Design a protein with these regions (language model features):
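Mid-domain, small-residue-enriched loop/turn segments at the edges of structured enzyme/sensor domains
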Residues: 1-40
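A penicillin-recognizing enzyme superfamily signal
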Residues: 33-185
C-alpha cells in the first residue's frame, strides 16, 4: 500500500497527471487530492487512541473446509499519545451532535465522532467519521476536475443547492454506517 499513489489511482485518474500532495494545514478538510482510504486510515488511528494500522485488503484466505491458510496479522504502531487522541475524539463528537454534521447526524444512534469538509467553491465535500467498531470516509466530487457542486439539478431536487460535507457526504456516511453496523450491539 502506498498512500499517495493509491489515492490518485483510487479516484479515477493517472497518478502522474495529478497535482502533487501538498502538506497544507487544511488537508483534513478537503483541499488536497486524497483518497477516502487515506482519510479513513488517518481517522482510524485517532479512533484507536493513536495506534495506527496500515490498511490492507485481505483479512484471511480459507480452504473450502474453512481451514485458514492465511490470516492478516498486524500489531500496529503507536503514533499519537492516547491522551491527544482522546481529546481529539471528544472534539470530533461535537461535529456530529451539534456541529457541521448535525443536520444529518444529530440523531445517529451510536457513539460516533467525525469531521466534515468542503473545498473552496464546493468542488469536493467530505465526511470522515468513526464509531468504536468502524471508520468510514465519504468523498463527493468529480475525480478529474474541480467542478463546483452548486445548483446541480439532481442535488437541488433533493433539497440541496450547494453540496458541503454536512449534506450528501454526511447522509451517505450515515446510511453506510447504519447498514454496516446493523444488528451489532
Amino acid at each position: 500500500y502506498h498512500g499517495n499513489t493509491l489515492g490518485a489511482l483510487a479516484i479515477g485518474g493517472n497518478a502522474w497527471r495529478r497535482e502533487p500532495f501538498l502538506p497544507l494545514p487544511l488537508t483534513a478538510t478537503g483541499n488536497n487530492v486524497m483518497a477516502p482510504s487515506d482519510m479513513a486510515a488517518g481517522f482510524q488511528t485517532i479512533a484507536n487512541q493513536g495506534l495506527h494500522h496500515e490498511p490492507y485488503f485481505v483479512e484471511f484466505v480459507a480452504k473450502p473446509d474453512g481451514t485458514r491458510i492465511y490470516t492478516h496479522e498486524v500489531t500496529g504502531t503507536q503514533v499519537l499519545d492516547p491522551g491527544v487522541a482522546n481529546a481529539t475524539i471528544a472534539t470530533l463528537k461535537g461535529v456530529i451532535r451539534s456541529g457541521t454534521g448535525s443536520r444529518n447526524l444529530r440523531n445517529f444512534p451510536r457513539t460516533a465522532a467525525g469531521k466534515t469538509g468542503t473545498q473552496d467553491n464546493n468542488t469536493n465535500a467530505w465526511m470522515v467519521g468513526f464509531t468504536p467498531e468502524l471508520t468510514t470516509a465519504v468523498w463527493v466530487g468529480n475525480p478529474d476536475k474541480y467542478l463546483p457542486m452548486e445548483n446541480i439539478p439532481e442535488f437541488v431536487a433533493a433539497g440541496v443547492d450547494k453540496v458541503i460535507g454536512g449534506t450528501f457526504p454526511a447522509a451517505i456516511w450515515k446510511a453506510t454506517m447504519d447498514a454496516a453496523l446493523f444488528g451489532r450491539p
